């Protein structure tokens, strides 16, 4: 027998489950409190019951007089059970005395009267409510709704007018307009809109009026005029009001206006609207960039659909104008944008706006303390302005004032602009036949005085000198050149002295003043030899070469040769020696000169003869000996290579073989520098090795071994 199974069965019978607990709890729960039903048998019992209920309500209200739900239940009980309207109204009035601003109680009170069809009481209560709380829109809405439901339409208008006298929110105006629209009283609605936009002036209200005229009123010819008038009035009013100029609804109104004009087939009117908004400078100063961009986007879409080539180009021009205007407003120092913006304005022939824009641009002076690209672009704005006044406007006096103002802006002690000075001088010459030349000379003289504190301005001197040359004023030209030289010597860049001197020499050469040319060349050589003047670079070689070329052109070859001698003494470079050698083959010999002088022909056929070759070889030998003596192997190799090229062009086979034997052999060697070994190239000259009979050079040994190897091979 299984005792374990029996024991488990007994235990399970004695256990209490959760199901049993819940079942017992449900069976033993408290019964609901059932109040005994009270039956009223006579009038005394009724009055006793009423008194008891009223005491209960009053006790509750004494505990919390702000419990408006209790007041409401109290009043409803009086009506529902006792049909005592005066007592119920008394309860409502007592509640309002507690808090007259409690809007829900007002509405319940009014609904109470309406639900029992006490219309007169409800009207009186509504009138009292809006008089007591005129700023509460809900009470006004309830009032007009009640009167409209009662079809007392004239009273509704009176109530709305009372309401509007308190300057309510736009919702009151919208409700009044919607009321008139429901009964097709369009003239009344239009009159309300006229007052509406004056009290609540905004783009949104104008759009409501526009939508009303376009969508709610039947279309006829008179209505088309009304719609157009509303559009015009809305745009004019918004542009005239400082508070509404930045309203983004303006762009929406313009777009809606143009679309409406398109709908009535008035394409030119639509285009004129866009162009007026985008081209008028007065309007452009008023509207914001965001408005401008939206209007232009609408204009672009319009031209894509209804425009031709000219109108599309016009729209592109307007876009560029708006773009540059936005850029100059964002970055006033962007002179490229100023230039482009002004160019567009000039094409529009709006002279006053163009002049104002020029003035705006030139007021933004660059802050750079050096002659930067920004300064250059800024100065060109001045030049453009002056030319515009002179040539386009024909105002000579304005042009003169602009040139003078431009000169006052430039910091001449740091830098100047020759363009301004020269253009001003040309301006005076063009526009003043009597005194223009004198004025131009004063301007140019002033330019030299003010702008030469650091170094002379080459362009100024060049223009002034060319002007005097055209007039044949040689003495003035010489004075200018002398002043140029003087200022060049004072400045830091003394190389400009040589350049100005050479320009001076060219002038004297052109007027056949050869003695002056020679004197100026000699001055230049003396200056070049002065190390105190030229501290950074030495222009002696350049100056002497120019002097030599001058003598060569004048066929004064002996003087040129002596200058070459002086040059190789001071500047002994391979380049100078080679130039000297080739010079001897580039000039005619004495016999050739004599033959030319005796000849009647105007042209001389030059040819290199043996005299040229020997003289040139003599210079090459002298150069070779000089570099050999000074152990300048690389320079010596350069001279021999040039000599070889000369013999290839002008010499014989024998002379070419002789010079070829002089060519050095380049070998690699090693040497110690600061304890480190490095490779270098060395030049071995055969003629130097032949001069050493007691010692076989490395080259001769190498050649001997090579010959021996060839013999063995054979």
Curated annotation (Swiss-Prot):
Family annotation (Pfam families): HAT_Syf1_CNRKL1_N
SUPFAM superfamilies attached to this UniProt entry: TPR-like (SSF48452)
Gene Ontology molecular function terms on file: chromatin binding; DNA replication origin binding
PANTHER family: CROOKED NECK-LIKE PROTEIN 1, PRE-MRNA SPLICING FACTOR
HAT repeats, residue ranges: 48-80, 83-115, 117-149, 151-182, 184-215, 265-305, 315-347, 349-384, 394-430, 435-470, 472-510, 555-586
The family this protein is said to belong to: Belongs to the crooked-neck family.
GO biological process, one term: DNA replication initiation
Naturally occurring in which organism (per UniProt): Debaryomyces hansenii (strain ATCC 36239 / CBS 767 / BCRC 21394 / JCM 1990 / NBRC 0083 / IGC 2968) (Yeast)
Name of the protein: Pre-mRNA-splicing factor CLF1
Chain's role: Involved in pre-mRNA splicing and cell cycle progression. Required for the spliceosome assembly and initiation of the DNA replication.
GO terms for cellular component: chromatin; precatalytic spliceosome; Prp19 complex; U2-type catalytic step 1 spliceosome; U2-type catalytic step 2 spliceosome; U2-type post-mRNA release spliceosomal complex; U2-type prespliceosome
Primary localization class, coarse: nucleus
Entries under InterPro entries matching the protein: HAT, HAT_Syf1-like_N, Syf1-like, TPR-like_helical_dom_sf
Keyword set, alphabetical order: mRNA processing, mRNA splicing, Nucleus, Repeat, Spliceosome
Location(s) in or outside the cell: Nucleus
Subunit and partners: Associated with the spliceosome.
């Amino acid at each position: 027998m299984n005792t374990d199974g029996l024991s488990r069965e007994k235990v399970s019978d004695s256990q209490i489950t959760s199901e049993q607990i819940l079942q017992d709890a449900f069976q033993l729960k408290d019964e609901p409190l059932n109040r005994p039903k009270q039956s009223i048998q006579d009038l005394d019992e009724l009055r006793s019951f009423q008194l008891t209920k009223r005491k209960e309500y009053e006790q509750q209200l004494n505990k919390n007089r702000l419990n408006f739900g209790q007041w409401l239940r109290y009043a409803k009980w009086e009506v529902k059970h006792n049909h005592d309207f005066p007592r119920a109204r008394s309860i409502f009035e007592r509640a309002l005395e507690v808090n007259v601003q409690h809007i829900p109680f007002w509405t319940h009170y009014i609904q109470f009267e309406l639900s029992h069809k006490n219309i007169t009481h409800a009207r009186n209560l509504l009138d009292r409510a809006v008089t007591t709380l005129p700023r509460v829109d809900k009470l006004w809405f309830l009032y007009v709704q009640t009167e409209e439901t009662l079809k007392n339409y004239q009273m509704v208008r009176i109530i709305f007018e009372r309401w509007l006298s308190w300057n309510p929110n736009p919702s009151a105006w919208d409700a009044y307009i919607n009321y008139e629209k429901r009964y097709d009283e369009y003239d009344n609605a239009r009159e309300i809109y006229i007052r509406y936009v004056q009290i609540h002036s905004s783009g949104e209200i104008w759009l409501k009026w526009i939508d009303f005229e376009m969508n709610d009123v039947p279309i006829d010819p008179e209505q088309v005029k009304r719609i157009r008038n509303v559009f015009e009035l809305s745009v004019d009013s918004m542009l005239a009001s400082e508070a509404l100029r930045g309203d983004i609804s303006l762009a929406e109104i313009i777009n809606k206006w143009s679309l409406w004009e398109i709908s009535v087939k008035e394409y030119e009117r639509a285009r004129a609207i866009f162009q007026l908004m985008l081209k008028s400078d007065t309007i452009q100063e008023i509207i914001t960039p965001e408005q401008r961009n939206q209007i232009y986007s609408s204009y672009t879409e319009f031209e894509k659909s209804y425009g031709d080539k000219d109108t599309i180009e016009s729209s592109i021009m307007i876009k560029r104008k708006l773009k540059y205007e936005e850029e100059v407003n964002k970055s006033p120092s962007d002179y490229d944008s100023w230039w482009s913006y002004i160019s567009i304005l000039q094409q529009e022939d709006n002279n006053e706006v163009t002049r104002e824009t020029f003035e705006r641009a030139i007021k933004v002076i660059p802050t750079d303390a050096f002659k930067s690209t920004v300064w250059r672009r800024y100065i060109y704005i001045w030049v453009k302005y002056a030319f515009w006044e002179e040539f386009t406007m024909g105002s000579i006096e304005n042009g003169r004032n602009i040139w003078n103002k431009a000169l006052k802006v430039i910091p001449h002690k740091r830098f100047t602009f020759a363009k301004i000075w020269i253009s001003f001088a040309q301006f005076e010459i063009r526009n003043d036949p009597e005194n223009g030349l004198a004025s131009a000379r004063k301007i140019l003289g002033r330019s030299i005085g003010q702008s030469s504190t650091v170094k002379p301005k080459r362009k100024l001197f060049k223009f002034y000198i060319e002007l005097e040359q055209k007039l044949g004023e040689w003495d003035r030209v010489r004075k200018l050149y002398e002043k140029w030289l003087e200022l060049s010597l004072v400045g830091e860049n003394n190389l400009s002295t040589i350049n100005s001197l050479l320009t001076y020499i060219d002038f004297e050469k052109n007027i056949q003043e050869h003695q002056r040319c020679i004197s100026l060349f000699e001055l230049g050589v003396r200056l070049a030899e002065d190390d105190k003047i030229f501290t950074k670079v030495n222009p002696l070689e350049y100056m002497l070469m120019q002097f030599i070329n001058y003598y060569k052109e004048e066929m004064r070859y002996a003087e040129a040769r002596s200058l070459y001698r002086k040059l190789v003494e001071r500047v002994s470079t391979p380049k100078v020696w080679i130039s000297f050698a080739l010079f001897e083959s580039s000039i005619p010999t004495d016999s050739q000169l004599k033959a030319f002088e005796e000849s009647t022909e105007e042209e001389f056929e030059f040819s290199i003869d043996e005299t040229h070759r020997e003289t040139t070889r003599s210079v090459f030998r002298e150069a070779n000996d000089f570099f050999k003596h000074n152990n300048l192997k690389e320079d010596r190799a350069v001279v021999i290579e040039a000599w070889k090229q000369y013999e290839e062009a002008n010499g014989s086979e024998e002379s070419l073989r002789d010079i070829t034997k002089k060519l050095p052999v380049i070998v690699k060697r090693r040497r110690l520098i600061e304890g480190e070994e490095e490779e270098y190239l060395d030049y071995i000259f055969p003629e130097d090795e032949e001069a050493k009979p007691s010692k076989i050079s490395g080259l001769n040994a190498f050649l001997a071994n090579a010959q021996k190897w060839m013999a063995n091979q054979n």
